[in-house]
């Protein structure tokens, strides 16, 4: 009796472990697929975020690499191709292999317009997906966060932010 209970518990633990590993692999796969969507469409990026650097992909596309989880990633607006995919199709649900509606929230980005000579943080409608927020496209949640992460220390001083 004890052995059968032990085996049943072990089977449940094994099933949960396998599900967790598959979900992790699946989430990484979804993030990689969405990342590939960005690279394939090669959107223009200013890469103004703190601690970010321009990197060149194999196809020649220049993208902005920022620390994982940093709101600096979102100093550029989300590329339209990714924004549209998440707004229209929703957030990938890796555990059910489906899509859930994206929550529409306000996020901030740095808009630099060389024609009108303006440079400021502006809000936009952002498709929030909890599973993608940290790993793929985290964006500043407030104007203050945008100013902190999207302007250098010198720019912040000139603007009177600090």
Curated annotation (Swiss-Prot):
Q: Does the keyword Signal apply?
A: yes
Q: Which Pfam families match?
A: BPTI_nem
> Could you give a single Gene Ontology term from the biological process aspect?
negative regulation of multicellular organism growth
Q: Which interval of the chain is the signal sequence?
A: 1-23
Q: Where are the transmembrane segments?
A: none
Could you name the Gene Ontology cellular component terms for this entry? extracellular space
Phenotype of the disruptant?
Mutants display an increased body growth rate during larval development and male tail morphological defects characterized by thickening of the male rays, with rays 5 and 6 the most severely affected in most cases. RNAi-mediated knockdown results in increased body length.
Superkingdom to which the source organism belongs: Eukaryota
Q: Where in the cell is it found?
A: Secreted
Keyword entries, A-Z: Secreted, Signal
Q: Say if the entry is tagged with keyword Signal.
A: yes
User: Which function does this protein serve?
Assistant: Secreted protein that is involved in larval elongation, early adult growth and male tail development.
According to UniProt, the name of this protein is Protein lon-8
Q: Which organism is it from?
A: Caenorhabditis elegans
């Amino acid at each position: 009796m004890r052995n059968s209970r032990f085996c049943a518990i072990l089977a449940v633990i094994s099933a949960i472990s396998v599900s967790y590993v598959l979900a992790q692999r699946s989430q990484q796969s979804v993030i990689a697929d969405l990342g590939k969507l960005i690279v394939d469409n090669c959107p223009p990026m200013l890469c103004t975020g703190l601690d970010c650097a321009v990197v060149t992909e194999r196809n020649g596309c220049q993208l902005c690499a920022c620390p994982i989880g940093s709101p600096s990633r979102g100093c550029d607006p989300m590329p339209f191709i990714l924004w549209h995919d998440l707004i229209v199709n929703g957030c990938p649900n890796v555990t059910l292999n489906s899509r859930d509606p994206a929550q529409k929230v306000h996020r901030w980005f740095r808009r630099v317009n060389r024609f009108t000579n303006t440079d400021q943080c502006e809000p936009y409608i952002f498709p929030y997906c909890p599973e993608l927020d940290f790993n793929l496209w985290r964006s500043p949640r407030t104007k203050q966060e945008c100013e902190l992460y999207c302007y250098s220390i010198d720019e912040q001083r000139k603007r009177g932010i600090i």
